[in-house]
Amino acid sequence: ICEFVLEKKGHFTLASGRNISSMRKPFQSLPITSTPAVLLNGAGIYDYEHEKMLRFHPIDPAGYELVRAVTKKFPAVEVEILTNDSAYTINAHMFANIMLRADNLPHRKFKRIDEVPPENWGKVIFLGMPPLVSAVKQDLLSIKDPNVNFMSSSISSFELLDKGIHKGVGVVDISVLSGSERSPT
């Protein structure tokens, strides 16, 4: 990376499902701080050099309704909702609390979905024991044209993003923001 970025003047970034706080250390350990990072699996583009969110793709309100339906149908599921700069949890127990510690973000815990501010959600993670998450995943994937993107991140988590959002979109966003004439590789 050092040779590519420093000697050849190339551009390199990291694309991750992580948030601003949990991505900071790995990102800043590389010589790439002048290039923004892709966060929240493409929902956010963050500039660590200027400490500024450059682009954020919040989940459509249809996504909120899906989360509401999941928490009603699967009351044991834990939910972590990541915004551009904070986290909310619903029904936080073992899995969501571990995520909150790892994320190291300002956060608020809620018992019910109706208590959660419904704006600025970048990524929703459904968490729990593998059989529960598998049932949630199966239920969500059975929806025709859900107007959101789903991503399987582990056997104990399943993620929801705005429709059309993924890490590749974030890389293209960086290319557009930087005025790059070449397509990202």
Tell me the role of every PLM-derived stretch.
Residues 1-96:
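Active-site phosphate-binding/coordination module
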Residues 76-185:
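Conserved acidic, metal-coordinating active-site core of Asp-based
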